[in-house]
Amino acid sequence: MFSSAEVNEQDAPAYRYAYLEVEGPYSKLGSKQAEVQALLKLQKVNYTYPITLMMSDPRVTQYKQRVARIGFLLSSNANVAEPLKLDTIPARHVISVSIKAHPLFAYGKTYGALVKYCEQHGMGLQLPTVEIVEHSKLTVQMPLGKE
């Protein structure tokens, strides 16, 4: 049996994260995430779940021009050193799409449900989307309220 994506409108909390920016094909995100994790371990920084900010829509952006931030969530008092960067996403109102599925299926199902929601509500995809993987559950959040 296949899982269905769950779509909700909700208030998302603020997130503090360490990251590296990636330009080019999104297929490189996995190796960049491993690099961020290794740097955090080397710097002895405690981290929790993986986070990705998709800054470009792959449906309309050539693969060499795509931009993403990939990293890990941190506590409010953690600090990092170069080459890692630190940022905070403020609390905001979002459309949240979640699914617990194998990664090969999870991303397609969540973004498919998000695009369908946007079409049904007469809106376009708002960027950046935030992806968080927690206990094998992928959650994609799209910001609302700035149209």
Predicted region positions:
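A solvent-exposed interaction/effector surface
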Residues: 1-147
